[in-house]
């Protein structure tokens, strides 16, 4: 079959216009190849302008590209490898390995990155809790199987370690796989994550794909779709429960806004693209549970200037089922994971879904921590002695609850020297209930720090007492 060849007519940064023969225009989202400086530059069709010209977005640098160069329509969208061959490997937006190891493409299945979301009939509509084995997450902001979770936190509060522990737990306890999409990531962070995963041993259950900060907006826009396509294969063809990490979802929106004006669109609020909600919806609607398996997505959310009303985070919030907020104030107390139990939320923390006992225990934990927070000013000024007996008991139990929300992680074992633990939701509820009921008022609060179950705390207390 003869190749469909066009000619480059205009280059504006990452946006390239190509003229094709009449009646031979490539379809929207098709990949078009241009030979440039000894390698193939891939551009993706974004618009058909009339006069047989298509406007495309480049997936790599357009340095050195000239008018009248030949451009070949591939006839399909950008394709990435899927399946077992991707595990333990790192790819770019075009599905090319970037970890420096050989990659045999002979029997590898390739899938296009643009796909339709599952139909309503295929989706599983019954909300179901996804057990992570992390006490504070399961109790306070339980994740929905096939849901979307927003992970909020500044630098150095433990986002990466929490992500690694989730990858480890889904691999060891659920036999599941993970896909990590680095969207507009710092190259250094991606590099650190890769080597940390190799050290902690979870790399073989994970596929990684990166569109780094230094890459053109086209690559950063599409890398989330590349990662999602890899995850969809594990869900649909292998019936797996998959964890999909997107770090950072804001960069996906940011990349879209960078090319929006060059594509000739009028900017909307705060200079964002007018198609913001559509682009976000196209990505998020593909992340769901089906009758075959599920994709549960954890998305790191950067909030520009801490303004939650900014259109980018505000559009993301509309899709989230749960939010996990990491707090620097909690890391300063030495409590890890540093999840803020008063700021984190979940749509399924509802007695109809998680059960009455779970719901009541979670709410009581939040109530006692809130009361402790209110009393802290009094304690700071007047000291503990000025509190009523009831408030003294509240403070004592709240401090134990606060410490019991911490837990040793498997992936941090080489730093802490403490073996990590996976705690079932039943054990989690039982432990917090016993503390709230006052069954462990006689134990020192240090016994509750970095332990798994309540039985572990009792054993630790005996060791402390000698």
Curated annotation (Swiss-Prot):
Membrane topology term: Peripheral membrane protein
Keyword Ion transport set for record: yes
Keyword terms, alphabetized: ATP synthesis, ATP-binding, Cell membrane, CF(1), Ion transport, Membrane, Nucleotide-binding, Sodium, Sodium transport, Translocase, Transport
Ligand binding (ATP): 153-160
GO cellular component: plasma membrane; proton-transporting ATP synthase complex
GO molecular function, one term: sodium-transporting ATPase activity, rotational mechanism
Keyword Membrane: yes
Modulation of this protein's activity: Inhibited by nitrate.
EC number(s) on file: 7.2.2.1
Main location per the UniProt record: membrane
Catalytic activity: 4 Na(+)(in) + ATP + H2O = 4 Na(+)(out) + ADP + phosphate + H(+)
Location relative to the cell: Cell membrane
HAMAP family: ATP_synth_beta_bact
Function, in words: Produces ATP from ADP in the presence of a sodium ion gradient across the membrane. The beta chain is the catalytic subunit.
Quaternary assembly: F-type ATPases have 2 components, CF(1) - the catalytic core - and CF(0) - the membrane proton channel. CF(1) has five subunits: alpha(3), beta(3), gamma(1), delta(1), epsilon(1). CF(0) has three main subunits: a, b and c.
Family the UniProt entry places it in: Belongs to the ATPase alpha/beta chains family.
Protein name per its UniProtKB record: ATP synthase subunit beta, sodium ion specific
């Amino acid at each position: 079959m003869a190749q469909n060849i066009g000619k480059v007519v205009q280059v504006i940064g990452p946006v390239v216009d190509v003229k094709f023969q009449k009646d031979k225009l490539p379809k929207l989202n098709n990949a078009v190849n241009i030979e440039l400086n000894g390698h193939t530059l891939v551009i993706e069709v974004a618009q058909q302008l009339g006069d047989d010209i298509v406007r495309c977005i480049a997936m790599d640098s357009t340095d050195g590209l000239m008018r009248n160069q030949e451009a070949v329509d591939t006839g399909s969208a950008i394709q990435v490898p899927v399946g077992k061959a991707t595990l333990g490997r790192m790819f770019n937006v075009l599905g090319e390995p970037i970890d420096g190891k050989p990659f045999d493409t002979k029997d590898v299945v390739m899938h296009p990155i643009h796909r339709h979301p599952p139909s309503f009939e295929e989706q599983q509509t019954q909300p179901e809790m996804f057990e992570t084995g992390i006490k504070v997450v399961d109790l306070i902001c339980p994740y929905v199987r096939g849901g979307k979770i927003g992970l909020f936190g500044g630098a150095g509060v433990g986002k990466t370690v929490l992500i690694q522990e989730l990858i480890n737990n889904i691999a060891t306890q659920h036999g599941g796989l993970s896909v990590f999409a680095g969207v507009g990531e710092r190259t250094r962070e991606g590099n650190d994550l890769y080597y940390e995963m190799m050290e902690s041993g979870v790399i073989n259950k994970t596929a990684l794909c990166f569109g780094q900060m230094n890459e053109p907006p086209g690559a950063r826009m599409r890398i989330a779709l590349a990662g999602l396509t890899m995850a969809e294969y594990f869900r649909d063809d292998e019936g797996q429960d998959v964890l999909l990490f997107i770090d950072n979802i804001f960069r996906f929106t940011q990349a879209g806004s960078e090319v929006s004006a060059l594509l000739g669109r009028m900017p909307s609020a705060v200079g964002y693209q007018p198609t913001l909600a559509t682009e976000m919806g196209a990505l998020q609607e593909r992340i769901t549970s089906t009758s075959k398996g599920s994709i549960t997505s954890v998305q790191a959310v950067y909030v520009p200037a801490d303004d939650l009303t900014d259109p980018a985070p505000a559009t993301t919030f509309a899709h989230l089922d749960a939010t996990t907020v990491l707090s620097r104030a909690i890391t300063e107390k030495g409590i890890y994971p540093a999840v803020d139990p008063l700021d984190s939320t979940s749509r399924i923390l509802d007695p109809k879904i998680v059960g009455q006992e779970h719901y009541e225990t979670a709410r009581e934990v939040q109530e006692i921590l809130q009361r402790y927070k209110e009393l802290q000013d009094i304690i700071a000024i007047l000291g503990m002695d000025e509190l009523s007996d009831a408030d003294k008991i509240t403070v004592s139990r709240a401090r134990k609850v606060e410490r019991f929300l911490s837990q040793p992680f498997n992936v941090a074992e080489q730093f802490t020297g403490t073996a990590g633990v996976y705690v079932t939701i039943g054990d989690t509820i039982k432990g917090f209930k016993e503390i709230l009921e006052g069954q462990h008022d006689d134990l020192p609060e240090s016994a509750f720090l970095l332990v798994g179950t309540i039985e572990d705390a009792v054993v630790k207390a005996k060791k402390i007492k000698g």
